[in-house]
Amino acid sequence: MAGRGGLLMLENFIGGKFLPCSSYLDSYDPSTGEVYCHVPNSGKEEIEAAVEAARAAFPGWSSRSPQERSQVLQRLADLLEQSLEELAQAESKDQGKTITLARTMDIPRAVHNFRFFASSILHHTSECTQMDHLGCLHYTVRAPVGIAALISPWNLPLYLLTWKIAPAIAAGNTVIAKPSELTSVTAWMMCRLLEKAGVPPGVVNIVFGTGPRVGEALVSHPEVPLISFTGSQPTAERIMQLSAPHCKKLSLELGGKNPAVIFEDANLAECIPTTVRSSFANQGEICLCTSRIFVQRSIYSEFLKRFVEAARMWKVGIPSDPSADMGALISKAHLEKVRSYIKKARMEGAQILCGEGVDKLNLPPRNQAGYFMLPTVITDVKDESCCMKEEIFGPVTCVVPFDSEEEVIQRANNVKYGLAATVWSGNVGRVHRVAKKLQSGLVWTNCWLIRELNLPFGGMKSSGVGREGAKDSYEFFTEVKTITVKH
């Protein structure tokens, strides 16, 4: 709906209805730095209303068969697909990502999330064992848990929101979702499709606002037994504190400091363009992006030269430009945070080979105040540097040499995170050997970001708790019961 000054004004979606809020937050267009819409600044009152709606909807929705719920998810996928271009344009404007990425990755993946879980919910099986000597049969059944709190981040807004909503409602739960207040538009747009798809009122509730106000009210509510969160480690720690008194079930997908390990027998013709993409896709604002590149010393100079040349070829432009490879970062505060790491690297004696402070960024006059930054490559940086230890979450990557396999495994693992890694080598034995030793929940070899949704997704160490995927998400969003029948 139109709000103050003709700007878009979002509303909460509770119990199948759009409801206004008493106060609103400004939301900025990352490409211009200008306010372009208003987002509800919700709090405890809105969460109470959402809990009431979700509670009322749970008995009816949970009693529907998996086949019935599957049909609803399929219809919602169809409606999202029919709105693909509208959603892609909104996602690009709201988040700063390129329109090409929104069209080819974000929105198609949101569609696929519903289709995937609409199918997978039909194929889960239960366990059964017999104890003939005691005349007993044991079997398991799974049931939905109740109300799920789903908190999604700003980097892949609809993509990751639907990755949580789809398995939660497929399993028979009702949900209260809180998208990031920085990127709320496509979630609001999806709400308009829920009734058409046949989603009953109260099954999906979306409440907008900040973490401290609405997020804390949601995760601490005693009637919300499930929390699925994707975001930062400090926020996850706060969620754990607030939920601990209620012994809630948690799924936490957090950050990464992901290494690429490039051996001397790597196919550089494939490795270099893929590693540029894994470093800078979506402005480096993907938890799976590569931010530490270890290159075997014998090919280090050649790799570095070609990698920097390829990085400089990436076009930073306004998000609506189909030829742009990178758009704008999410906010002014985030841009300043990312730039601060470049300053720290310089102070530590590192070299900036391209990007921030080295190359010139050319933008149209209207976008001069936007949150843009060039792909930046850092070298001569120590493993103990903050740029090699901390998640920057921007278009910044460090390239360093290594000598031996044992050495690089130790160095790659020498961070608190363990989300993803890539390994490049033509030696199949080495690929398997190194992949097993890397402390990462996901390891891609000679590729990046090829996903199989049936398999577990998640990280080790400080990169999270739990896994997501067909089997893992189903188990998280259900409770298992063992039944014994003596005959």
Swiss-Prot record:
A GO BP annotation: retinoic acid metabolic process
- Please tell me whether the keyword NAD is annotated for this protein: yes
Q: What is its EC number?
A: 1.2.1.32
The UniProt annotation places NAD(+) binding at: G231, S232, Q233, P234, T235, A236
Which reaction is catalysed here? 2-aminomuconate 6-semialdehyde + NAD(+) + H2O = (2Z,4E)-2-aminomuconate + NADH + 2 H(+)
MF term (GO), any: retinal dehydrogenase activity
Top EC category: oxidoreductase
Any single GO CC term annotated in Swiss-Prot or TrEMBL for this entry: cytoplasm
Compartments (UniProt record): Cytoplasm
Q: Which PROSITE patterns match?
A: ALDEHYDE_DEHYDR_CYS (PS00070), ALDEHYDE_DEHYDR_GLU (PS00687)
Residues flagged as site, Transition state stabilizer: N155
What Pfam families has UniProt attached to this entry?
Answer: Aldedh
Active site at E253 (proton acceptor), C287 (nucleophile)
Q: Which UniProt keywords apply?
A: Cytoplasm, NAD, Oxidoreductase
Pathway given for this chain reads: Amino-acid degradation; L-kynurenine degradation
Record's function text: Catalyzes the NAD-dependent oxidation of 2-aminomuconic semialdehyde of the kynurenine metabolic pathway in L-tryptophan degradation.
Family recorded in the similarity comment: Belongs to the aldehyde dehydrogenase family.
Protein name as annotated: 2-aminomuconic semialdehyde dehydrogenase
Q: Which organism is it from?
A: Bos taurus (Bovine)
Record gene name: ALDH8A1
